[in-house]
Amino acid sequence: MKASMFLALAGLVLLFVVGYASESEEKEFPIELLSKIFAVDVFKGEERGCRGFGDSCTPGKNECCPNHACSNKHKWCKVYLGK
């Protein structure tokens, strides 16, 4: 009984959101709605200034992230263990 009530309520909420979104003329409405619901801006990508584990690199340049080092043999960043 509780599960069916929850399912019915979730269906009504979904129907309301879809109906409201179809009336909206803005193309970015779903992204704006989700960012307001979760109060985070996860839809904008961020560029990292360094290269992480397994990324290609050039030995001698400081391209890898902290605690990583560029392997002279394989030419990719790997974890630096301090040896």
Swiss-Prot record:
Cellular component, GO annotation: extracellular region; host cell presynaptic membrane
One Pfam family matching this protein: Toxin_12
Domain of life: Eukaryota
Keywords: Amidation, Disulfide bond, Ion channel impairing toxin, Knottin, Neurotoxin, Presynaptic neurotoxin, Secreted, Signal, Toxin, Voltage-gated sodium channel impairing toxin
Residues annotated as signal peptide: 1-21
Subcellular location: Secreted
Main location: secreted
Disulfide bonds: C50-C65, C57-C70, C64-C77
One MF annotation (Gene Ontology) recorded for this entry: toxin activity
Expression across tissues: Expressed by the venom gland.
KW Disulfide bond (keyword) present: yes
InterPro entries attached to this UniProt entry: Huwentoxin-1, Huwentoxin_CS1
Residue ranges annotated as propeptide in the record: 22-48
Domain notes: The presence of a 'disulfide through disulfide knot' structurally defines this protein as a knottin.
Family note: Belongs to the neurotoxin 10 (Hwtx-1) family. 15 (Hntx-3) subfamily.
Subunit-structure text: Monomer.
Protein name per UniProt: Mu-theraphotoxin-Hhn2f
Annotated organism of origin: Cyriopagopus hainanus
